[in-house]
Amino acid sequence: MSDMVKIATRDSYGNALVELGKEHDNLVVFDADLAGATKTGTFLKAFPERHFDCGIAEANMICVAAGMSTTGLVPFASTFAMFAAGRAFEQVRNSIGYPHLNVKIGATHGGISVGEDGASHQCCEDFGLMRTIPGMVVMSPADDVEAQAMVRAAYLHEGPVYMRFGRAAVPVIHEEGFNFQIGKGETLREGKDVAIIANGLLVAEALTAAEELAKEGIEAEVINMATIKPLDEELVLAAAKKCGKIITAEEHSVIGGLGEAVCSLLSEKLPTPVKRIGVNDEFGHSGPAGALLKAFGLSAENIVAVAKEFCK
């Protein structure tokens, strides 16, 4: 997949906001002194009167966005995942989640692919934190096309939404016009020996891994599970029944994220062997994104190794 066009989903987020802003006057965007990094600066240029910079005060930003949502506006509150899910968790829980307000959170720079910024900014806990909030939708797109469709779906959804976008450029695997639905996964490649359920930048790695596994006689199914909550239970159960083995792959801690959601479902409804690929019980490090992904086992090579051992 090295020859495919690559785009960072944070860029997709900024572009999608501009397009939606042209169509909907009630869309407003908030940032916390990071408009350049979150790419909401493109919206600022297009609609300066509908962009609000709250400074380095993420908790305040969440509360202001919550207040504005009660007037009929649809706020998109944007900052790094570490600050959106970490620093402002109390405000997200109590000011958005508890009253079930129509606020969308665009969290960029999630996972260890943040790179040189290091462990303090590499949020690998956000899915887990946001999943615990009742009524919160939690999503992570695989590429540019899905990210833009996801932002549109989030706008149309009534209620709180958390979306994670990445800093690193990822291959575009979807065709234009892709029909994204909240709570629905998609099978990108059919297989019968093992099902790899991934999201975010690990989807492209899973597809590459499946190609390599096929050369060795292992037919891997690849599922893009962009919505972590609500999980597409029907698709997970169908894959478990068909393949009998599941691998989850995510740029997140193995605690609290996609892997845990899949395991919780299967343990109750269809006990199935599962291998979780993600960040183990440790913090990240500073370094180039590609090197970090390999070091933490978040690569096609490691998915291949895990699948081969699993399918023995």
Describe the residue ranges of each PLM region.
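Thiamine diphosphate
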Residues: 1-164, 169, ...
